[in-house]
Amino acid sequence: MKFAGIIAEYDPFHNGHAWQLAQAKALGAQHVAVAMSCGLTQRGALPLLPEAVRVQAALQCGADLIFALPAPCACAGAEAFARAGVRILAAAGCDALVFGAETPDAALLMEAARVLNSEAYRTELKRQLAAGARSFAAARQAAVEALCPGTALAALLDKPNNNLAVEYCKAILEQEAPMTPVPLPRVGAGHGQALAESGHAQFASASALRALWAEQGADALTPYVPEKALELYKKAEIDGMYTDYAAAGRCELALLRAACARPEAFAAVRGVSEGLDHRLENAVRSCTGLPQLLDALTTVRYPRARMRRLAMDAALGYTADTVPALPPYLHLLGARREALPMLKNTALPVSHSLAKLEKENADCARMAAAQAAASDFGALCRRVPGPMGGVYRQKIIFLTN
């Protein structure tokens, strides 16, 4: 492993992320590239802090190159999120993918990925869903258990980071990416775990840190984030460069209400099927807040996380026709200067300028437009709102040792 890749959100960057970067280099990586969520996150919401703050924190704590994981790819389920991240890092030339997992066994994770990529699994999954499985996740586990009874594979899928790890392995197999999976054990708090539950004074999950910021401000993150990152967070707080989630919810619902004026308003939105467009429109017309809207949409069949992403897609007008399925370019957000030679032979167009990238081809233009929509939305929803077009004016962040 010489050129490792990491897929991350850094929302916000914390001690666990710094530990992961250090581990990648301890295992032999000379450089580490990161595909980082840009504009939106996998939970279907805006990141707490803008890209410039998160990129600088990661560079100061060990990352060498940071690429944007475009907003439509970041605001996606685990499978699409993983495919996009692997596509970016493979195109950049990474020879290994480093990620966290509750079960850090590369062979077992790859075995699970091969099962999930098989035709036998797809057939069994359909059978489980038709038989009335209580959820897609339950159907998936049941399908794997039916195909591989008595193994640890089905139980593997019961943990959130294992699930994402298997999706990373699936993407490596599907894309025939020359990358070795390198799973690391989770340290400290688990995915979505509250501070009180973590049992560790130094590590906390990103969701717990966002909640802590909302309650007590950036200073309260002191035990859980690197000192260099904390300095950036305190400045962002003073400058109002963080997301006002109450304002974001109102703005998102306003966009959804405006869309209702159009016939078949949500029929073409990504992920819409089985009448979900009508369900969404009815909820938008009757609900007065985003939490209420999500409550109305969420069922056992339609998990809240999926509905959260669907609502954001609908608000920003993301459709299958307007948004490419995979990133068509490498948008470089930040770099250590000594790592730039690693980009001499990329498999996709690479630039720090989105204006330049959007001129490469039609897919690049569509992805750039989708990115701009998310970035402009995010700028409006900060504690101190910003103007449109920031994603085109944003300069690359260089760090020189």
Which role does the model predict for each range below?
Residues M1-R54:
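N-terminal catalytic cores of NTP/NDP-binding nucleotidyl/phosphoryl-transfer enzymes
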Residues I7-A8, T41-Q42, A58, P72-C73, ...:
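Short, contiguous strand/loop micro-motifs
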Residues K25, L59, V86-A90:
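Non-catalytic positions within long, well-ordered alpha-helices that form the structural scaffold/packing
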Residues A26-A29, Q56-Q60, A138-Q141, T180:
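Short hydrophobic/aromatic-rich motifs at helix boundaries and adjacent loops
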Residues P47-E51, L59, A78, A82:
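Generic structural signal for well-ordered secondary structure
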Residues V55-P70:
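A glycine-rich helix N-cap at a beta->alpha junction
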Residues A68-N401:
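Active-site cores that bind ATP or allylic diphosphates and position pyrophosphate for catalysis
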